[in-house]
Amino acid sequence: MSKTYHFIGIKGSGMSALALMLHQMGYKVQGSDVEKYYFTQRGLEQAGIPILPFDEKNITEDVELIAGNAFREDNNVEIAYAIKNGYKFKRYHEFLGHFMNQFTSFGVAGAHGKTSTTGLLSHSMKNITDTSYLIGDGTGRGSANAQYFVFEADEYERHFMPYHPAYSIITNIDFDHPDYFTSIDDVFSAFDDYAKQVQKGLFVYGEDSNLRKITSNAPIYYYGFEENDDFMATDIIRTTTGSNFKVKHDGQIIGEFHVPAYGRHNILNATAVIANLYVAGFDMALVAEHLKTFSGVKRRFTEKIISDTVIIDDFAHHPTEIIATLDAARQKYPSKEIVAIFQPHTFTRTIALLDDFAEALNEADAVYLAQIYGSAREVDHGDVKVEDLAAKINKPAKVVTVENVSPLLDHDNAIYVFMGAGDIQLYERSFEELLASLQTHM
């Protein structure tokens, strides 16, 4: 394969995953990005994929250009050079929509839970049959012989509209991305348009009132916890090692399952995967076998222990996701104090969901807040401050800085849950260094 793909913005989570997948399929891959370290670049470096600085010299006749969605003529020299000199390029989602047509494709969409569900589906399928996949945590796997392709479908700016998958899961519909969507009706409209493009089977959460209204040309299967769902999770036992449950379909139990994951939402994610694979003709015994070994995806309830202290890192940046993450923490650590450290992501989302954020964070035993992380797409007009959120939480909520996370030490028998989509990991790293330094001075 002589073609070289050049990724403009290769460190983006979707872009890095796609680059890895194409590399593993035998294509030549390179990319450019800013110098700042991003967690996705480790996989790229391990694969030997060149990461170059942004430079118009990277744009040559012998490369096919794939551009990250955030990059435009006015903010990127490579895009500007390509447009000026007549080089064509595809956006990530445009390329993917065309590329996936050579496979039987399985999409995962939804306001929340996309990445975890895509991870669970791809893990199960790759252990049963040759499968390529793209996950939103920056993970990708490619095989030149794969018949199946699993991917995460992002609703932001309706990026999923070039996709026409054979099957798709939609985990839920919720109001998010207020910088783009105008209302919940606007969000619903986007998902409804996407659903109409699914070809063989659509799997949606049955207790979501919006998803009950969704329409598709493909058969629609509802999953959930209720008798009127086509696939119902039942006999649920939640323990400190995960969740056990059975799935009922057409009045029959189709299997008993265990997932080493926590929280009600992960039972739903697994039920969606089971329903999809059942309809697609996969052996339920094999599905059950491989669900047991799922180790999770990056930045979704990722745990580490530093100096005997449990630290959880999670991408949760919406009230619904915060509630789910704290529920998972309580399931695994029922006797521990749950300390939440949350960084709001974008000023527009913080303004739109301020009361909901406060209500969600009330589920923690103690709350700390980091300064709002503004998106590159917006300007801080001073309309909201993190102190506004702190004032609405029904317990003292202190604001911490990267330079001083020592207030977190005021807890015994606690686990620390760091949540956010910005640079909350800097706060987490600072806390880890503080714990390590205390250990060395004991």
Swiss-Prot record:
In which residues is ATP bound?
G110, A111, H112, G113, K114, T115, S116
Recorded catalytic reaction(s): these are: UDP-N-acetyl-alpha-D-muramate + L-alanine + ATP = UDP-N-acetyl-alpha-D-muramoyl-L-alanine + ADP + phosphate + H(+)
Q: What is the E.C. number?
A: 6.3.2.8
Primary location group: cytoplasm
Keyword entries, A-Z:
ATP-binding, Cell cycle, Cell division, Cell shape, Cell wall biogenesis/degradation, Cytoplasm, Ligase, Nucleotide-binding, Peptidoglycan synthesis
| GO MF | ATP binding; UDP-N-acetylmuramate-L-alanine ligase activity
Q: In which pathway does it act?
A: Cell wall biogenesis; peptidoglycan biosynthesis
**Where does the protein end up?**
Cytoplasm
Entry keyword annotation includes Acetylation: no
A biological-process GO annotation: peptidoglycan biosynthetic process
Gene Ontology CC, one term? cytoplasm
Q: Which Pfam family is one of those matched by this entry? A: Mur_ligase_M
State the family named in the UniProt similarity comment for this chain. Belongs to the MurCDEF family.
Q: What does this protein do?
A: Cell wall formation.
Entries under NCBIfam families matching the protein: murC (TIGR01082)
- For this entry, the protein name equals UDP-N-acetylmuramate--L-alanine ligase
Species source reads: Streptococcus thermophilus (strain ATCC BAA-491 / LMD-9)
The gene behind this protein is murC
